[in-house]
Amino acid sequence: MTDREQFFRDVNKIVIKIGTSSITRKGCDHTKENCNIDPAFMESIAAQVYELRKHGKEVILVSSGAIGVGLNELGIAPKPREIPIRQAAAAVGQSILMQDWSRAFSKYGMKVAQILLTYEFYSDRVTYLNLRNSISTLLEYEVVPIINENDCTCTNEIEAIFGDNDKLSAMVASKIDADLLIILSDIDGLFDRNPKTHSDAKLLTLIKKITPEIESYGGDPTNFKGVGGMRTKIKAAKICSMAGCYVVIANSEIEDVVTKILSGEEIGTLFLAERHIQKNRARWIILARASGTVRVDAGAKAAVLGKNSLLPAGIVDIEGTFDRGDVVKLECEGKVFAKGITNYTSKELIKIKGAQTNQIDNILGYNNYDNVIKKENIGILEGIN
């Protein structure tokens, strides 16, 4: 077994970030931004995702390209600096992008879902919780989430905050506890110097730790179409490393590149992760300060310990005042056995405790979630039998 096979053996949740230069890579002038989509490339990605899904892997895509596609559709000259024009292009291009992704995945009987994000998604707790729950639910229904920055509503942030979605993909990967982020672009990986100007540049296949020297290898954007150069990719890898997520930067032109990466082939640059430090999201939940206590019966405790979500039917009592998105203790017969992030406020739980899931709407007048705490948002305390 190769080193990479060993690293990727337990990889289950994968984020694949696809750059603008990959989506439009064939028959396009690289000095321009407005280019047509490459349907063959999209179908190749869909085929590889399909194979991963057959092996039980969960896959999320982060897809760039909306602005470039929109500019081409509207017949606008490349690289306009006016934000309203770029926003309009993003709105037009995003719909085309999703239609083509849907068409590509439909050939393999798969459905896709569009998720557009702004900077707020990782700075606001409730928005972040909504994102996690939405992606988790889509994956449960075997839908492929396709994420992009919401360029249409950004102002000065447009293409600047996330850097052609490099940072966005890293933030998504870290927030949903992904095991691996694959960044596909038109470059082979990280070199010790610029390969365009140095014929003896060496491809670095393994980065164990991102040091100042490694960061110095990041340069300017690789072309005029995307805005994400190697510097932003190194920053993305740094974010993922701290979250316990591996990162591979590879060239999208390699045939079946995703499949080959997961099979252990030494393609591109692999950034190792501090998996022993922060991989377990449950550890953060366990160490977080609880805002209240949810008391449950023995049946609910057994369900939670069996890695199931907490439902309102098993709740006996509520203690404290807390909001949606807060961490709460789970207690049974006087003993705290877990902590979790609640989907409902303390006032709401007082009303729906002991109720069946199908009764929530009648009691509250709405039903935001069938579960009180999703299984992914529960941390079991050590020593619980």
Curated annotation (Swiss-Prot):
Record keywords, A-Z: Amino-acid biosynthesis, ATP-binding, Cytoplasm, Kinase, Nucleotide-binding, Proline biosynthesis, Transferase
Molecular function as annotated in GO: ATP binding; glutamate 5-kinase activity; RNA binding
EC number, as in UniProt: 2.7.2.11
UniProt domain PUA: residue ranges: 291-367
Function noted in UniProt: Catalyzes the transfer of a phosphate group to glutamate to form L-glutamate 5-phosphate.
Family: Belongs to the glutamate 5-kinase family.
Cross-referenced HAMAP family: ProB
Protein name listed in UniProt: Glutamate 5-kinase
